A protein has these predicted regions:
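Glycine-enriched, solvent-exposed interface loops adjoining structured elements
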Residues: 1-242
């Protein structure tokens, strides 16, 4: 069952035989416990890609012919999962979404450096770092890379269709970091079945950090729930079979 931040803090304080509170800000201990709950939440989010955090996203196009194949990830993206581009030619009404494959920066540069910039279908663009890049201007993109884990650089664009790559032609999904509101009635964005593990982990951390006492029962339950969630996640992804 899902619980609010206040309900989680109240449960933790009750297990620690602390004073009852009606708000997370009532006492220094309740405030400290709420901060530990927050850090536990983000630690739990970071240790796997939670299916419920996978969302469609819209890339941000450069909007400048100086960098026609540059696009930027929006804020809050943890990991890009899928990237397709509509490769329909000008005048075609049927959509042609095709996968665009990732190459690491070294492999991307090696591939692009085989191009001959004396040919009319090759542009020389300058990245924001000042590095020159060779790109094709007569076809939709097939590959992309990133030099800073934020800006995506594609290998080509079709100048007969668009002057730059268009975000309206992108199909993309990514794992997103959920937002946090430090309020009594805030409900952390986790599946209902993950709350037991989440709360037990927070209990163990609060017991140790606030009382310097190891809560063996909470640690054991957190470990048991964590193992169960791990098996469940892999089963969804086609890993462990029962």
């Amino acid at each position: 069952m899902k619980k609010t931040l206040l309900e989680i803090v109240q449960e933790i304080l009750n297990d620690m035989d602390s004073d009852e509170v009606g708000s997370i800000t009532d006492t220094m201990e309740s405030s400290q416990a709420s901060e530990i709950v927050k850090s536990t939440y983000f630690a739990m989010l970071s240790n796997r890609n939670w299916p419920h955090t996978k969302k469609p996203i819209q890339l941000i196009a450069s909007g400048t012919p100086d960098r026609p194949t540059h696009m930027t990830l929006p804020e809050g993206v943890k990991e890009l999962s899928v990237l397709n581009y509509n490769k329909a030619k000008g005048g075609e009404t049927r959509k042609h979404y095709k996968s665009v494959r990732y190459l690491d920066p070294d492999a991307f540069l090696r591939r692009q450096n085989y191009l001959n910039n004396d040919n009319d279908n090759i542009d020389v663009i300058v990245d924001v770092t000042g590095v020159e890049l060779l790109i094709k201007n007569d076809k939709a993109p097939e590959y992309f890379t990133s030099f800073d884990d934020t800006v995506l650089v594609f290998d080509s664009y079709d100048s007969t269709t668009d002057s730059t790559l268009q975000n309206s032609k992108v199909q993309a999904s990514a794992y997103i970091y959920p937002t946090w509101s430090h309020l009594d009635d805030f409900v952390p964005d986790l599946p209902a079945e993950a709350f037991t593990s989440f709360i037990e982990e927070a209990k163990a951390k609060c017991s140790f950090k606030l009382r310097q006492v190891v809560d063996q029962k909470a640690e054991q339950e957190a470990g048991r729930q964590g193992r169960w969630l791990s098996r469940k996640a892999r089963r969804i992804a086609g890993g462990i079979k029962y």
